[in-house]
């Protein structure tokens, strides 16, 4: 009988241990055999090897099926029996008719990760483990093969052992949380055999066997009947992940040698490349380089790799372009041997200006333009302010608030259109109160704060 030994599992945690150190770990527990075995392994690793020294299991009640709460409470009982600390969480669907949603699987996934993210923030947890395994990886590969566009490959990396927690970029603090998958090297039959060997109790979700419910269920049934394909799919994911690591390392080297400046208050990136050096790099490397640079400036939730692929050569050929709401301006310098590239936020359209003007309350972070988390504190807690882009009419007011030297420095740091893509706080009569990304506060009773969503 093929099982997973405790030492084997612990060895797969070694690289994770280096990342996590002595911080508390979280575990996402559905109650199924995968997450219950993961919880058991964590407890046994703590007893036998002294790590993790602290962990907590988060039991998520999805509230989609009538008996889901009963199953969640049974899972908590099973965890308590193993002396595993746990917290009950549930998804609040509000007035939504869950079963009328055509994309229920996707929405449920989003809600689940958001609930887990908030729990991690509440419990000061930076790393949470899920029980994804090799069969899940194979299913993901087949899902992406069915959906991907010809000529793209990024999605074929599938699930990585370590990644940022997904579906939670609208939650302040989510970017600090990593998702760990220590069971990814192991197959479902190994997990089942190991759980049975150690007498671990779990709950079965009957909907997982309904091939008419979701595409993933149908793919799971197909792969169960063709075990060899599961192995080949996981090998494919491993190969693409190795390719991604090699490209990432090259991009790291290029950025280290070629970044001129990254102005965080405006999210503007300036680089300078040797044209001869650029020619030596593959298209894949240049595409990943551009994608990495764009993520530091974009206001898009996701950047389509296809848009980067189609325009990559034009960018490095010195053309002015817009990609993913970023303006890319390049020029040749030093006898045409070098290429200088600046990436900044694309100027707002009239429609965007309206959307980017919002009323906010004190002491609560608000994500603005998907780039900056803005918050302000005020002695009068009833005070509401307007969060909006800087406008040309604000410059005269700004001259009155800043010294001549400060105003000149500000204009140099954010020249031209760039200055009109940064956020300001104002009263309802448009009187400036502050510029949070620069740390400017123009009212003594108000202090603004900014967290930058993207960091170099």
Swiss-Prot record:
Alphabetized HAMAP family for the sequence: tRNA_Ile_lys_synt (MF_01161)
Function of the molecule: Ligates lysine onto the cytidine present at position 34 of the AUA codon-specific tRNA(Ile) that contains the anticodon CAU, in an ATP-dependent manner. Cytidine is converted to lysidine, thus changing the amino acid specificity of the tRNA from methionine to isoleucine.
One cellular component term from this protein's GO annotations in UniProt: mitochondrion
Record Pfam families: ATP_bind_3
Listed name of the protein: Probable tRNA(Ile)-lysidine synthase
Residues holding ATP: 30-35
EC number: 6.3.4.19
Domains: entry comment: The N-terminal region contains the highly conserved SGGXDS motif, predicted to be a P-loop motif involved in ATP binding.
CDD domains per record: TilS_N
Similarity field: Belongs to the tRNA(Ile)-lysidine synthase family.
Keywords, ordered alphabetically: ATP-binding, Cytoplasm, Ligase, Nucleotide-binding, tRNA processing
């Amino acid at each position: 009988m093929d099982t997973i030994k405790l030492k084997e599992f612990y060895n797969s945690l070694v690289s994770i241990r280096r990342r996590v150190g002595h911080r508390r770990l979280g575990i996402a527990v559905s109650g199924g055999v995968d997450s219950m075995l993961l919880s058991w392994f964590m407890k046994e690793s703590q007893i036998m090897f002294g790590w993790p020294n602290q962990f907590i299991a988060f039991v998520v009640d999805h509230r989609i099926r009538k008996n889901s709460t009963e199953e969640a409470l049974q899972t908590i009982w099973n965890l308590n029996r193993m002396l595993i600390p746990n917290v009950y969480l549930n998804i609040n669907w509000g007035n939504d008719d869950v079963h009328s949603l055509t994309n229920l699987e996707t929405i449920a996934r989003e809600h689940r990760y958001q609930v887990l993210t908030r729990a991690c923030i509440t419990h000061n947890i930076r790393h949470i483990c899920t029980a994804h395994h090799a069969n899940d990886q194979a299913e993901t590969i087949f899902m992406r093969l069915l959906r991907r566009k010809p000529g793209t490959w990024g999605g074929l990396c599938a699930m990585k052992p370590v990644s940022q927690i997904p579906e939670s970029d609208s939650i302040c603090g989510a970017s600090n949380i990593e998702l760990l998958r220590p069971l990814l090297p192991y197959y479902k039959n190994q997990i089942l055999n190991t759980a049975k060997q150690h007498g671990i109790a779990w709950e079965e979700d009957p909907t997982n066997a309904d091939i008419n419910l979701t595409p993933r269920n149908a793919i799971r049934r197909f792969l169960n009947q063709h075990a060899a394909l599961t192995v080949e799919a996981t090998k494919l994911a491993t190969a693409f992940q190795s390719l991604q690591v090699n490209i990432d390392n090259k991009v790291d080297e290029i950025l280290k040698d070629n970044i001129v400046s990254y102005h965080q208050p405006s999210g503007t990136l300036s680089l300078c490349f040797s044209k001869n050096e650029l020619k030596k790099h593959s298209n894949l490397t240049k595409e990943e380089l551009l994608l990495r640079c764009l993520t530091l400036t974009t206001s898009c939730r996701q950047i389509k790799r296809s848009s980067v692929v189609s325009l990559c050569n034009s960018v490095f050929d010195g053309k002015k372009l817009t990609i993913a709401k970023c303006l890319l301006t390049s020029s040749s310098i030093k006898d045409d041997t070098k290429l200088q590239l600046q990436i900044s936020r694309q100027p707002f359209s009239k429609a965007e200006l309206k959307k980017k003007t919002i009323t906010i309350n004190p002491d609560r972070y608000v994500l603005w333009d998907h780039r900056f988390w803005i918050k302000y504190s005020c002695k009068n807690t009833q005070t509401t302010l307007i969060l909006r882009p800087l406008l040309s009419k604000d410059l005269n007011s700004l001259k009155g608030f800043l010294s001549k030297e400060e105003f000149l420095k500000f204009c140099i740091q954010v020249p031209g259109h760039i200055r009109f893509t940064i956020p300001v706080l104002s009263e309802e009569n448009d009187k400036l109160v502050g510029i949070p990304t620069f740390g400017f506060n123009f009212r003594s009773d108000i202090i603004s704060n900014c967290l930058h969503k993207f960091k170099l």
